[in-house]
From Swiss-Prot:
InterPro entries: Chromosome_partition/occlusion (IPR050336), HTH_ParB/Spo0J (IPR041468), ParB/RepB/Spo0J (IPR004437), ParB/Sulfiredoxin_dom (IPR003115), ParB/Sulfiredoxin_sf (IPR036086), ParB_dimer_C (IPR057240). GO terms for cellular component: chromosome; cytoplasm. The keyword Transit peptide does not apply. The lineage of its organism: Bacteria, Pseudomonadati, Pseudomonadota, Alphaproteobacteria, Caulobacterales. This is Chromosome-partitioning protein ParB. Its main location: cytoplasm. Keywords: Chromosome partition, Cytoplasm, DNA-binding. The keyword DNA-binding applies.
């Protein structure tokens, strides 16, 4: 299977509230457009295909050849049925940058079209990123690493929280947290994810292993299911703990435990560790200052 890989993450900074869907975001833009002189905003129209530019910050970087070919065949027969969402190019006067619909634009070029329908919006960089993530995640067009990188950019560049992101895309906060953990996997394991040799479920199961590359190869060679992978990972040494007391290999936490740790950590603002021992276990909350301890005690006594 061949893929066309384009673009690299890296956004200009800006701040804007999340927690709303694509239609709400576009509705907000329509309510108060910042129209540049001579720009036609709102309705769709035909535009020469060569004046459209891809967005270098597009969350989706991989386009499967077979998907592009199928879409180009459909476009030859029926045309581009949905307008491509664009904004005025920030770099070149008279041209437009694609906000949503790059796959249609690429397929239209293959189909030999000279013009495509576009819909122009005035959007800032954060709105462009939000729309790109929402469109691709809701359509399952992003691979899991592209999805994780998009979340990382929103958090690091635009100071969004995992809860904000989860509300925007309609996923759980633990889904966002678990997806972002995959960025810590070695490059070789990440390449298996992109190629489809491993699923996100496989990758999450081995994320805490001391040697995820070896486990990944074993999973691929054995054709293991996610459940079989989780059982395999529980027997493997953990990355963080090394050897446990008595020289026994430490237990690998399952994805549910890791997600619960992340949820509690997000609520408390402190590092949280959960260790199961049969039907019992230990919940450890780590604080760095006495002020954090005092705040934790106050919150626990009055109810979080």
């Amino acid at each position: 299977m061949e893929s066309v890989v384009v673009g690299e993450p890296g956004m200009s900074e800006g701040r804007r509230g999340l927690g709303r869907g694509l239609s709400a975001l576009l509705g907000e833009v329509d309510a108060a457009p910042a129209q540049a002189p001579g720009e036609q905003l709102g309705g769709s129209r035909e535009a020469p295909i060569e004046i459209l530019q891809r967005n270098p910050d597009q969350p989706r970087r991989t386009f499967r050849e077979e998907d592009l070919e199928d879409l180009s065949n459909s476009i030859r027969e029926k045309g581009v049925l949905q307008p491509i969402l664009v904004r005025p190019s920030p770099d070149t006067a008279g041209e437009y940058q694609i906000v949503a619909g790059e796959r249609r634009w690429r397929a239209a070029q293959r189909a030999g079209l000279k013009t495509v329908p576009i819909m122009v919006r005035e959007l800032d960089d954060l709105a462009v990123l939000e729309i790109g993530i929402i469109e691709n995640v809701q359509r399952a067009d992003l691979n899991v690493l592209e999805e994780a990188l998009s979340y990382k950019v929103l958090m690091e560049k635009f100071e969004r929280t995992q809860e904000n992101i989860a509300q925007t895309i309609g996923k759980s906060r633990s889904h966002v947290a678990n997806t972002m953990r995959l960025l810590a996997l070695p490059d070789e394991v990440q390449s298996y994810l992109v190629s489809g040799e491993l699923t996100a479920g496989h990758a999450r199961a081995i994320a805490a292993a001391a040697d995820p590359v070896a486990l990944a190869k074993q999973i691929i060679e054995g054709g293991l299911s996610v459940r079989e992978t989780e059982a395999l990972a529980r027997k493997a040494p953990n990355l963080s703990a090394g050897k446990s007391k008595g020289g026994r290999p430490p237990r690998v936490k399952d994805t549910d435990t890791q997600a619960l740790e992340s949820d509690l950590s997000s609520v408390l603002g402190l590092d949280v560790s959960i260790d199961h021992r049969g039907s019992t276990g230990t919940l450890t909350i780590t604080y760095a200052t006495l002020e954090q301890l005092d705040d934790l005690c106050n919150r626990l006594t009055r109810g979080i």
